[in-house]
Amino acid sequence: YRGCLLGLAVGDAMGYTVDNRSWQEIQEDYGPNGLLGYDLVNGYADVTSYTQLAAFTCNGLLFGLTRGQMLGKMAPFIKYVGMSSREWAASQRPWGRPTRNYCWLLRKAELCRRHCMDTRMLDTLSRQTLGTPETPANNYDSPGGITTAIGVGLFFHEDRTDQHEIDLLGAETVALTQGSPSAFLSGAVLAHIMSRLIRQPHLPLKRLVAEAVEAMKEQFGHQYS
């Protein structure tokens, strides 16, 4: 689990510096072999906004589980993911930080550093109502947005949660801010593959991908062709 999140942090810390740039542009800045290390900020690699958001999603899932175990009752997990996503978004603005914090990650300065340049996502998270697959908040499709589904895939597996519920929650977490079906269905696919890998780590990836595609057709095909 830790290795997966660290892998995201490491990869995005390197990758965001060359995002949306051509190979020629990268070579001009970093030499003929391209980017070979981090662009350090005060001696440290950046914790990017999508890494932060993935971590806060995990925080929300853990908060919901803890509440359920301690109090014997809880709301649907997506409510806690929405709450944690809003608190992260508030940390990315110079104003409007919440007076009551539910996410303990807000005490980690490196996970709250203002790094998000995606104003559309921040605007969506500031609205009174967040998106769902049935009632999308927008038609947005940001590739980094599916990182929110990573926590779902890590947190659940078939032994304790129905696979359809896992896939739906993967879609719902992305749909909070990304209204395009191609975005939130990708979240469902990612959650499906990761949860299955946890249960059966030796299954071939090609088989898992094909299985995930069929599962999406079965679960979402009547709504999205």
Which stretches of residues belong to each language-model region?
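Structured, active/binding-site neighborhoods that engage oxygen-rich ligands
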Residues: Y1-S225
